[in-house]
């Protein structure tokens, strides 16, 4: 937290008018508590998306409205295996948390990305029940007039043939997510630079000269699953790409899984594969802004890399979001040979308050999602928003940020009055710098009247 003291010049005054705005927001966004969703109600919601078997309907009727029948969410598979739907157990989470028009959802066999989201839904439900969180109804209602159908056509995974040139059992979820995005763009034709590092588990060195790699996009298939019979050239093409992405992002391989950090993938895209990229986190941007960024990228025709980590567990999963529907649910491609690919809710993981049990603090699952925005440098796509790039130095408040006028009454004060201002929870999203942070005071005409610096300005700031 920074404390700032300043005195305004004679003849200048500052009045912050906010009461009217606050009153209007209260009028249109009334906070209310959600209602439990029972199996019988959940079935009625599910019927709008899929065809249910008679047994499922009968079971729901039998459970009735007993409290013991309540659940954080209800999973229903289509009677003909033509999709599934996940219905929320509390209507403050929305009606539907996920749905697909193909395949089924088996929680025992679900990929890590699906399990991560389902666990996050469970945590959200628990917070709603234990903390009695108030949710803004207005914020979660309304339809989107523009939608984006899934951009990716690929259904890639981590085993054969994707791991064929890595020398290890799994290519890694980070490499699979990035490679699928690159396949969508068919870029670049050739890599650049080199990388070498140690694979810790095996205590061996792994390296690659990307300038020697020519990516055969035309020979890569969108789907290598049975009954597809790929040629050796088609398998080699995707295996080379997957290995290069893994090496460029310092992939750590083990017999049971392979993983790395998204920040390394972000750097690799720029350094080795000729992309402009931005690393964006939900914790810094805030849930509403984060979702807006994702939607705009998708509207621009650009899929987005996502990475999530469950609370209390360092191991996460990386995948791609490549579309969204009229209700704001995002389509996820989990890089698991198509398994679990569907529309999922991200917004219900965003709670503005968490109740007295959690001292009103955002929980881990609200902060644990980050994104990589990546655009090929081929001139075919709109530029990434400049303010999101690391090359655009800027300070910004994160979701808990605030500016407080400590000593002012009624948000106004005399021009000659010395005033203490406190700012907290802001971050530097750009390059590191050494300096100071100040506050500028503008009059009603937009003229800068005075600039005030921190108490430590005389000794060099921070």
Functional labels for PLM-detected ranges:
Residues 72-140:
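Autoinhibitory propeptides
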Residues 15-28:
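Bacterial N-terminal signal peptides
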Residues 355-420, 443-447:
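Short, compositionally biased P/S/T/A/G/V-rich stretches that sit at domain boundaries
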Residues 60-82, 267-333:
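Active-site-adjacent substructure of cysteine-protease-like catalytic cores
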Residues 438, 445-462:
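Solvent-exposed serine/threonine-rich low-complexity stretches and specific carbohydrate-binding patches
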Residues 33-67:
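Short, non-transmembrane alpha-helical segments in secretory-pathway proteins
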Residues 88-104, 327-346:
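Catalytic Cys-His active-site segments of thiol-dependent hydrolases/isopeptidases
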Residues 35-48, 159-218:
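Active-site nucleophile-adjacent alpha helix/oxyanion-hole segment immediately C-terminal to the catalytic cysteine
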């Amino acid at each position: 937290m920074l404390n700032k003291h300043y005195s305004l010049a004679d003849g200048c005054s500052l009045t912050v008018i906010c009461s009217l705005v606050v009153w209007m927001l209260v009028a249109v966004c009334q906070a209310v508590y959600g209602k439990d969703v029972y199996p019988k109600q959940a079935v009625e919601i599910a019927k709008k998306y899929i065809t249910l078997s008679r047994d499922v309907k009968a079971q729901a009727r039998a459970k009735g409205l007993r409290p013991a029948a309540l659940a954080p969410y209800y999973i229903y598979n289509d009677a003909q295996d033509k999709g599934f739907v996940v219905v929320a157990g509390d209507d403050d989470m929305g009606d539907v948390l996920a749905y697909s028009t193909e395949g089924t959802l088996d929680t025992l066999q679900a990929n890590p990305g699906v399990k991560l989201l389902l666990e996050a839904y469970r945590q959200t439900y628990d917070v709603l029940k234990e903390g009695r969180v108030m949710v803004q109804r207005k914020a979660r209602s309304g339809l989107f007039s523009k939608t984006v159908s899934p951009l990716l056509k690929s259904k890639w995974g981590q085993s054969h043939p994707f791991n064929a040139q890595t020398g290890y059992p799994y290519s890694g979820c980070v490499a699979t997510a990035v490679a699928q995005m690159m396949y969508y763009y068919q870029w670049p034709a050739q890599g650049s630079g080199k990388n070498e590092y140690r694979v810790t588990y095996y205590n061996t060195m792994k390296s690659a000269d990307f300038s020697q790699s020519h990516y055969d996009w035309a020979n890569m298939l969108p789907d290598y699953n049975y009954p597809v019979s790929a040629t050796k050239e088609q398998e080699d093409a995707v295996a080379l790409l997957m290995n290069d992405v893994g090496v460029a992002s310092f992939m750590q391989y083990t017999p049971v899984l392979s993983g790395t950090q998204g920040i390394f993938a972000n750097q690799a895209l720029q350094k080795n594969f000729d992309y402009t990229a931005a690393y964006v986190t939900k914790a810094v941007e805030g849930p509403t802004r984060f979702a807006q960024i994702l939607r705009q990228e998708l509207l621009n025709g650009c899929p987005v890399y996502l990475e999530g980590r469950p609370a209390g567990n360092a191991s996460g999963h990386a995948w791609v979001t490549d579309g969204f529907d009229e209700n704001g649910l995002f389509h996820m491609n989990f890089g698991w040979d198509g398994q679990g690919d569907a529309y999922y809710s991200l917004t219900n993981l965003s709670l503005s308050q968490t109740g007295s049990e959690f001292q009103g603090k955002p929980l881990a699952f609200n902060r644990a999602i980050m994104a990589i925005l990546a655009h090929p440098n081929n001139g075919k796509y709109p530029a990434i928003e400049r303010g999101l790039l690391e090359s655009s130095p800027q300070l910004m408040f994160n979701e808990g940020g605030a500016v407080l006028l400590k000593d002012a009454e009624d948000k106004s004060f005399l021009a000659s009055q010395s005033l203490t201002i406190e700012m907290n929870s802001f971050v530097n999203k750009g390059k590191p710098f050494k300096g100071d942070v100040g506050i500028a005071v503008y009059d009603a005409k937009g003229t800068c009247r005075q600039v005030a610096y921190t108490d430590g300005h005389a000794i060099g700031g921070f």
